[in-house]
Amino acid sequence: MVIIMSEAELKEAMKRNPHLRRYIENFKRTYMRIPDFMVSLSRELKELKYPNIIYPVGDPIFIHIFGTPETKTKYIVIEPTLETAEEKLKYKMILNKILELAPYEETPKSVEEFEEVLTRLFNACTKVTEAVGEEGFFQRIFRFADNKIKITPEERDKFLYILKRDLIGLGNLEPIGRDPYLEDIHVIGPKNCHVVHKIFGMLPTNITWEDEIELADYLKNLGERMGRPVSDANPIVDGTLPDGSRINIIYSTDVSPKGPSFTIRKFTDVPISVTQLISWGTFSTEVAAYLWLCLEYGMSIFICGETASGKTTTLNAILPFIKPNSKIFSCEDTPEVKPPHPVWQQLVTRERGPEESRVTLFDLLRAALRSRPNYIIVGEIRSVEAAVAFQAMQTGHPVLSTFHAANVRKMIQRLNGDPINVPLTFMDNLNVALFQLAVYQRGKVLRRVVSIEEIEGYYKEVDGVVTRAVFQWEPDKDRHVFTGRNNSYVLEEKIAKAAGYEDPRDIYNELELRARILEEMIAREIFDYYQVRDIIWAFYEKGLEGLPFPI
């Protein structure tokens, strides 16, 4: 839902943030209009051909999305900057003084302590004064009695923000790191930073570095802070930022001729709910109800698709369908899955260090078999760990994972070929494969589940694996068709039998009931991930009586 900032709120924001006021004044002089100010955005804004929107991402940072018929839509960061030579000198002197005093402080144990120490040191070497007077240059900066650097209230806020941004935060990338509406960040050299916005797509930004040397130093610092140092000898590094976002760094100009480059896949603190994905058209209520039954009854599912198709988003969205008293075991290279269950054993690989101390996905999956989980979640299956995953399925441990494949034929080819090498006769241990793609339609990039396939098994007569499509997406009508109604192998032969139905086709009534529950949540605009989870779990505990609405 779009929430527009009131005039009073806008005036207050400009009063708190003089840099915002100056930006708007300059913009108005140039374009003879002012942007629309919004507290929050909605996907409806995607219809705007030439957006002119400013929204906050936490004081003192604002984002301006602006396009005209003559210029491409841009992503403009509005933040405090050092504007004059005097400000730059003051800031440099303050930073040097802080670095001189820092060794005498105890090492902070948390970000909060780091901020406290930094603020204390900043206050120790500065003095805020309203008037600068008519003194000379150095007299304006120093009050010689206490050797403190004289600064104005606006400079205090500005310098503290820049210090915390550069020493504690993400430096140049701090503003876009805070933006909840971003999916990816792409930097190729010091002057080329683009973002993928959840509403407006790929946009160029005004974020730059002075030159390749400054960008290389920035990436070195980032790598050290992640515990994944980069160098010419180790130019390609994958890591995780403090907020959980994934980053891939390509450091050396020998490998990246346009200059050091990197890509960040933004991490969402609270996962997107299944009802939200349904409302966006990613899949239908029937698809979600089918997945609900599959997870309720311990089916193994692969969420398949190409890069940036939304596989992990869908995986996280459907996790509340797993019963609340289940033990979840997750193993990943980079932590991304977030089961909302109280008994969740989260493990990640360790790729650095001596060979004998490294821990691979293969190692973690072997450990999973000894941990007695109800569900095993693998971030992404790419190699020999697939053999252990299929072994887990064989021994009654359902497995959820993402997998790179555009359709069921390519999925089976990848699983059966090098380096994975799962025998065709083992394929029926996997019950369901969901295929999701990013599709370009009517000038927009949409994420859609394009099909769901059930794996029946290997048949010697056809010398291949037989699969059955139960859902298909019709692109011309943008709808999902339940082609497996009264013809689903998994629902009738697996789930209905496990549920004890005399007539296996009664399982479709259960599917329709769950679809109605999801439809009612959407009608009531229940999109919060944890609210959706609570309703699903209340249904598990008390049936229809546990729901906060009639069905």
UniProtKB/Swiss-Prot annotation:
GO terms for molecular function: ATP hydrolysis activity. InterPro entries: P-loop_NTPase, T2SS/T4SS_dom, T4SS_GSP_E_ATPase. It comes from the Archaea. It holds the Pfam family T2SSE. PANTHER family: FLAGELLA ACCESSORY PROTEIN I, TWITCHING MOTILITY PROTEIN PILT. Belongs to the GSP E family. This is Uncharacterized protein MJ0900. It comes from Methanocaldococcus jannaschii (strain ATCC 43067 / DSM 2661 / JAL-1 / JCM 10045 / NBRC 100440) (Methanococcus jannaschii). The lineage of its organism: Archaea, Methanobacteriati, Methanobacteriota, Methanomada group, Methanococci.
